[in-house]
């Protein structure tokens, strides 16, 4: 390092982790602390430009620290707490826009830490500005909370279970997303579309969590911006690892869809490019135990987010590649995750369950539509079996006949039921049906298809599905198959009361079970609506759909379930005939007449897929899966 450079230096040590008395030059080998954390080491030298946030930014951070009202009581030195006082506290803020002084240099995002990701700073708009990521090989800066030494890395904090438990962060589980948004305020009078949101006001996890709930499971993942056309479930909020600007998305809400899509996707592509540079597995020996599980969790989350971006952009192959990458992590580290799950905090465990369930859901539905076998099929099977076996009790251990023992701290009982409204047993049957469809496709290609073997395998799956239908029907206040007309409309209203929430999920699973039967018959007999078994299964599916629809109206629940029901809707509606088609037309019409909260783009895609199948004659019916693949409309099925 030259003398002139040394003269400009105001502090000695590493600018990234603040490790004092570093013996290497800037651009040289990384320091031990940075190497252990797996982040890019800045070295030392003159104060980097990005270190000076300015007086306005510091004042805003100090104000938000007071607003959060959630101080931490840690046994750290008072001098360290005083040094870290100007930094944002645990209740992180997501600043979509910036004040008038920072508008020219781009927006800044501050995201709170939870002992894993840490509080990080991300800047956009400047080509030379660094990007931060919890596990990436690029620039990183920790904003230590009061009472936490700046010399400690975020993974050090995670590993220090005795000194600090992530659950001690006192996140407010009782507050709702709406209340948090109400408390948010604009950071600039001239940018009303930008808001600052206190992420600590959002529940980290809720037992009533549904796929459309805008909730931050990790402090690094900010709430999903409402009203994003067609993709409410895409994690398009301020995720530091994917470098997605929450403010940019909010600003783009008022722009035409075409213009908004281009700019938003540019941010997503930039984030995915940075994420691809991250190492696929922990490199340092310190990342063992809880650190390794947390590292895998971050990658499962990021690969899921990347797949959502890809499916939104219509790149189905890249979406499948990202899903396969996340599935490979689960496949490779399944034993470690199961064995070390007890070391994860309650919040981390539930976050892992959330992203794993969504990954399995998307992979199974995508495989069914593409007639392929998921890469991590055996892992999915074990997790789905564990969820199914523990559905009715509180047992924490269940043994599968197809694999090793699976422990529910990884995926707790009723996880699929709570997060998707569909039981794991039903999704397991869909996985089996998808594997059967892929098997037939391969046998036909090789010219060795045995109809007897095909029917025999289909009968085994059908017997399991019929058993699930009988069990689910017994849970309903009134059987959904007792109707007053052939159209499938129920003759009596359903019960009202606190059990309605469970009833909705039961009918939801029932719809999928009937659709799996229809899909099985289609695999064996082809897409022919004239097959009696297909017509009968569609009539039963109509009854379940009407019960769910009536329950939805009684509950006053918002629309938006059409993406979850997209797969069974296409299976049944595409092969419907006569009066059955009128029922599905009415279902679409009711969805289109909603209050605008539903994803109209998805509804139009469903309508287009089904009408293309109806346009052909009954003797030469078109398979809806072929329509989806040709039109590249896979995104309508994924969450």
From Swiss-Prot:
Location of the region described as Disordered in the Swiss-Prot/TrEMBL record: 58-136, 476-499
DNA-binding region coordinates: 14-41
Compositional bias of kind Low complexity: 68-108
Main localization category: nucleus
Gene Ontology cellular component annotations, sorted alphabetically: nucleus
CDD domains: GAL4
Highest taxon above the source species: Eukaryota
Localization in the cell: Nucleus
SUPFAM superfamilies with a match to the protein in the record: Zn2/Cys6 DNA-binding domain
Keywords of the record: DNA-binding, Metal-binding, Nucleus, Transcription, Transcription regulation, Virulence, Zinc
UniProt GO molecular function: DNA binding; DNA-binding transcription factor activity, RNA polymerase II-specific; zinc ion binding
This protein's record includes keyword Transcription regulation: yes
UniProt cross-references to InterPro entries, sorted A to Z: Fun_TF, Zn2-C6_fun-type_DNA-bd_sf, Zn2Cys6_DnaBD
Task of the protein: Transcription factor; part of the gene cluster that mediates the biosynthesis of the phomopsins, a group of hexapeptide mycotoxins which infects lupins and causes lupinosis disease in livestock. May play a role in the regulation of the production of phomopsins.
Protein known as: Transcription factor phomR
Origin organism lineage: Eukaryota, Fungi, Dikarya, Ascomycota, Pezizomycotina
